[in-house]
From Swiss-Prot:
Catalytic activity: K(+)(in) + H(+)(in) = K(+)(out) + H(+)(out)
Species assigned in the record: Leuconostoc mesenteroides subsp. mesenteroides (strain ATCC 8293 / DSM 20343 / BCRC 11652 / CCM 1803 / JCM 6124 / NCDO 523 / NBRC 100496 / NCIMB 8023 / NCTC 12954 / NRRL B-1118 / 37Y)
Compartments reported by the entry: Cell membrane
UniProt gene name: kup
Source taxon at top rank: Bacteria
Role according to the record: Transport of potassium into the cell. Likely operates as a K(+):H(+) symporter.
InterPro entries, A to Z: K+_transporter (IPR003855), K_trans_C (IPR053952), K_trans_N (IPR053951), Kup (IPR023051)
Keywords for the protein's UniProt record, in alphabetical order: Cell membrane, Ion transport, Membrane, Potassium, Potassium transport, Symport, Transmembrane, Transmembrane helix, Transport
Ranges annotated as spanning the membrane: 13-33, 54-74, 98-118, 137-157, 171-191, 217-237, 249-269, 296-316, 345-365, 374-394, 402-422, 429-449
PANTHER family: K+ POTASSIUM TRANSPORTER, OSMOTIC STRESS POTASSIUM TRANSPORTER
Protein name: Probable potassium transport system protein Kup
Length: 677
């Protein structure tokens, strides 16, 4: 949905929100109650336990999802975008450098937990097929076959990502609407089997079950309850797709359907409390509440909902990584834009890492029961980090220190309790997502602080003023004794105040082989907080052939630098700001702009590692940063210059002073000299 239409809700927008935003939280009923049942001491006298457990789910969704995320967090958007990195971009200040740490930890944890979501949702859905018949065919009660089916589904989902979801995405809303109506209806039907489940609306039962003798895990039951709200962070992250007003309206419907289903599952469990196989892993209350004639339809709908939830998570991962690249905390990654649909992107590295890790998890954990035991630990960390950033938002943007204090205390305590409860998952597989989180966080820290240390060490003699070299560039441009290197010579640079730019750029132009051009272009690309911004400004530096262009590009916009430069050059020619160029050989006989040649002048930062006084920590982090750079996309590819005329250069980081090291002439004479006439 277009950003300009997000200021108000519409029925179409609400339908899109149901299809995109609520996939993760909407598939939680597949496994939440099943996981909670593992905390039951026995299959007898379950009423108090079940009512208390459903009450915990109800109030968890009310407090964390509804109040924290839907009511409060959705106010903290950054140009309409949500999520932990968008929130950080909104609140970051030069004097609040500590805010970066919770943003990095939260972002890494969110990406790590996302590796488990497709695996657990799709596996749970397909497990519902066990023993079910379609005509004369009976699906085998064989977990290995389930794993193969899950593998095929996940491979198909990840393989088709590069094609985009413009066409198929139109059915997400209707499918998820059908899903929520389906689970809500059968939940309501089962509530009538034991109306005492309605007691779950009282918070007293939620508190009581934590200390109930029927609860064999005590407070650690919250680790399973938390599964009901793991999609809340994804809900916030997907705000930019549909707008907060559509989320407000659609959440009322979604929340109602979810609670009806959880209560229906609870009522079914209580009405079957004396069945000895009730606590068996093969007995999932989500599927058990369905009449036998509806089971196959339920499995198909669950599989579709799981696929859509996975799709939403994958798209959210692309957005999250793009925001991280925009903040310069992750190396540049090759990004494709499968269609002209706004916000559609594809990052192959992210896609296949999610796929590979997800498949490893499927085959390592084998069953949805084992995956549930590991799921949710990392997301509690993300939620705690979001709470810290929201505290800063309320205090800084809403100017309400009292509300900020109560917010961070209340939700900090609630989420800390959930984190402690989820720590019980560590030995049951939670370590897997924590390892992934630490790996992602390490990449972020090395890249960000590697850049900081690299710049701090090298900047002492690393910058020159472009203004000081205007005359030389103008003279070089007019020097007919030098061959024309290019009509338009373009450098991607970062120009600071007073026209300061890196010395390697001037070295590249005026070095041993001067590069003569009709027009010199120095292009600074700014990453805009507005995800869809495409704008530019021009500074001619008092000349007609030295141009500083600043491109402001949002992180959801394809950086087609060559196309933008041709448009800008033609505009400047039309305005008579730069002289027209008439190429001798060209397809466009009316063209007034010649060819563009791009120079990527890369400094050899490995020179830093050879400095005798460099600190061991600096050496380590800069080495790590250089290693990451060597394994990621080149700037020319990132800026869409693959089919352009690009020259990659490497220039020395330090130019040695010839006066510091002198060589001595033997015998103080030169032999056999012929003096010039």
């Amino acid at each position: 949905m277009l950003k300009e239409n997000q200021s108000k809700w519409s029925s179409a927008g609400a339908l899109i929100a149901i299809g995109i935003v609520f996939g993760d939280i909407g598939t939680s009923p597949l496994y939440t109650m099943n996981s909670i049942l593992n905390s039951a001491k026995s299959a007898h006298n379950l009423d108090t336990f079940v009512i208390g457990s459903v009450s915990l789910v109800f109030w968890t969704l009310m407090l964390i999802t509804t109040i924290k995320y839907v009511i409060i967090a959705l106010q903290a958007d950054n140009h309409g975008e949500g999520g932990i990195f968008a929130l950080y971009s909104r609140v970051k200040k030069p004097n609040k450098k500590w805010l970066l740490l919770p943003a990095l930890i939260g972002g890494a944890a969110l990406l790590a937990d996302g590796t488990l979501t497709p695996a657990v949702t799709v596996t749970t859905a397909i497990e519902g097929l066990k023993g079910q018949g379609i005509g004369e065919f009976i699906f085998p009660n064989n977990q290995t076959i389930v794993l193969f089916v899950v593998t095929v589904i996940l491979l198909i989902v990840f393989t088709f990502q590069k094609a985009g979801t413009k066409k198929i995405g139109k059915i997400f809303g209707p499918v998820m609407l059908t899903w929520f109506l389906f689970i809500g209806f059968f939940g309501l039907v089962n509530i009538f089997s034991d109306l005492s489940i309605l007691k779950a609306l009282s918070p007293t039962y939620a508190i009581a079950v934590l200390f109930s003798p029927e609860n064999k895990t005590g407070i650690f039951i919250l680790g399973s309850v938390f599964l009901a709200t793991t999609g809340a962070e994804a809900l916030y992250s997907d705000m930019g797709h549909v707008g907060k007003h559509n989320i407000y309206v659609s959440w009322i419907f979604v929340y109602t359907m979810l609670i009806l289903n959880y209560m229906g599952q609870g009522a079914w469990i209580m009405s079957h409390a004396n069945q000895e196989n009730l606590l068996m892993q093969s007995s999932n209350p989500f599927f058990e509440i369905l009449p036998s004639g509806w089971r196959i339809f339920g499995v198909v709908m669950a599989a579709l909902a799981a696929i859509i939830a996975s799709q939403a998570l994958i798209s959210g991962a692309y957005t999250l990584v793009s925001e991280a690249i925009n903040l310069k905390v992750i190396p540049r990654l090759r990004t494709f834009y499968p269609s002209e649909a706004r916000g559609q992107m594809y990052i192959g590295t992210v896609n296949w890492l999610l796929c590979i890790i997800g498949l490893i998890i499927v085959w390592a954990f084998q069953t949805s029961h084992n995956m549930e035991a590991a799921y949710g630990l990392s997301i509690t960390i993300t939620m705690l980090m979001t709470t810290l950033l929201l505290y800063q938002f309320i205090k800084q943007e809403m100017k309400n220190k009292i509300l900020a204090f109560f917010f961070v205390v209340i939700f900090g305590m609630i989420e800390t309790v959930f984190l402690i409860a989820s720590l019980g998952k560590f030995l049951h597989g939670g370590y897997a997502t924590l390892i992934i989180m630490v790996a992602i966080l390490s990449v972020m820290m090395i890249w960000f602080y590697g850049n900081k240390r690299r710049e701090a060490i090298s900047q002492q003699n690393d910058y020159l003023s472009l203004k000081d070299y205007r005359k030389q560039l103008i003279n070089l441009s007019k020097d007919n004794e030098e061959p024309i290197f290019a009509s338009n010579l373009v450098y991607i640079v970062n120009i600071h105040q007073n026209y300061m730019l890196k010395r390697n750029i001037i070295y590249s132009i005026l070095g041993s082989k001067p590069k003569r051009a009709e027009t010199y272009w120095f292009v600074t690309i700014r990453s805009s907080n507005d995800p869809y911004e495409k704008s530019y400004s021009v500074d001619m530096l008092g000349t007609n052939n030295i141009v500083h262009v600043t491109l402001n590009i949002g992180f959801k916009v394809e950086p087609q630098v060559n196309m933008y430069m041709k448009q800008i050059a033609n505009n400047l020619v039309k305005q008579n700001i730069i002289k027209p160029q008439f190429p001798k050989y060209t397809l466009n006989k009316r063209g007034t702009v010649g060819e563009f040649k791009y120079i990527m002048a890369n400094q050899n930062y490995e020179d830093l590692l050879n400095l005798p006084d460099i600190h061991t920590w600096d050496r380590f982090i800069i080495s790590g940063r250089l290693w990451l750079q060597s394994h990621t996309v080149k700037p020319s590819s990132f800026y869409g210059l693959e089919v352009s005329d690009v020259l990659e250069e490497t220039v020395p980081l330090f130019i040695k002073d010839s006066n510091k090291s002198k060589i001595k002439l033997i015998q103080n004479e030169v032999k056999n000299v012929i003096k010039p006439e």
